[in-house]
Amino acid sequence: SSAASDVYKRQDMGNVSDKDETKEDIKNAAENPEYIADETAVITEGLSIKGDLDSLGSIDLFGSVEGNVTCRGKLTVSGSITGSSKANEFFANDAQVDGDIEAKGAVKIGQGTVVVGNITATSAVIGGAVKGDIDVHGPVIIDSSAIISGDIKSKSVQINNGATIDGRCSQCYADVNMESIFDIKGKKNK
């Protein structure tokens, strides 16, 4: 029974530590808006939340949320969200998202995912279906399984064979001065 009591003590000590870490996370978050807690909240498949969901860390969402979801870490979705999502990174696989997605870093929309809303990020890989505009200040990769109904603004775009896009693609964030390249009259006068 000594081993069982050791396990209990370790679990109990872990809980105390977790509470201390949570208090520390709240303090750090108040002092630094960029702080990301080293924890992941899990919303299980059978759980449904009506209302906004906020986390200082990451969220793994297998259930459903009717409300806005905000987390400072990575938001991984295999369930459904009806509302906007803001995260450091956003990953969705076999998910349903009805609302805008905003990420400071990468957005990955996996095959089997349907998004009805705009996407804003630093980079994006799209393998699912998106009905909305995609605004990415870095690279965008459109996989062969992707279906997009909306405009894409990015620094660069890679469209794999088989992808379906109904919209415009613009590399408006690229480091290319289009006017100087196509200024034929100005080049002749020099």
PLM region descriptions:
Residues 18-47, 53:
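N-terminal domain-start segments of secreted/luminal proteins
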Residues 40, 46, 50-52, 56-58, ...:
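Detector for repetitive beta-architecture
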Residues 166-190:
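C-terminal segments of enzyme domains that contribute to small-molecule binding surfaces
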Residues 1-8:
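Short, small-residue-biased leader/transition segments that mark boundaries at the very start
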Residues 5, 14, 156, 160-175:
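Intrinsically disordered, low-complexity glycine/proline-rich and charged
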